Amino acid sequence: MTNLTRRQARRFLLLHHGLIGAYRFRGKQGAYDFVRQAGCIQFDPVDVCGKNAELTLQSRVQGFTKQTLWQLLYRDRLLVDYPDKNLSILPTEDWPYFERYRRSAREGGRQFEGLAEMEERTRQYLRENGPVNSDTLPVEGQMYWHSMIHWSGQWHGQTGAARSVLEQMYSTGELVIHHKEGARKY
C-alpha cells in the first residue's frame, strides 16, 4: 500500500483531472478522453460565463471550443446527453450500463394516465416529421407526470404534456437528444 501525504494526494488529484501541469488533453479527442476518464460531466443550462460542461472541458482541454462538444454529441455521437440524476454528458459506449435506469423509467411510466397513448402519437409524429421540441410537438394540455430517474416533471402537480412525453421517451431510451438549440432539446 502506498501512503500519500495530503499535499501529495491533492497534487495527484489535480494532475489526474488535468487542472495543473501541462495540458494532458488536446482538441476533440482530448475532450472525449476527459469525459471517458471522468465518467460523465453534468449538463447545466445556466450560462452566466459559459455552461458547466463547456467550462469543465475548457479548463482541461487545450484548444477546446463549444463546437468541439457539439460535434462529439450531435455529429460524431461519441457522447450522449442522458440523465445520471441530473442531465449529464457521458460516453456513448457507457449506454448499456444505464439499462437499469431505462427499465425503471419504462416501468414507472405505466402509472401515468394517458402517457402510453401520447407516446404512440409522438412516435408517429416523429416518424413523419423528424426531431421536435416540446413547443413544436402537437400535444396539448397538462398531465400528472414525473421522471422516475431524474429531477423532471412535477411530483405534486401537472406539467406540460408535450414536455412530459418527450422527457419520458428520453428517459426510457426510446429517444435520444438529436441536438440542442441553447437548452432546447430536439
For every predicted segment, state its role.
Residues M1-Y186:
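Long, low-complexity intrinsically disordered regions
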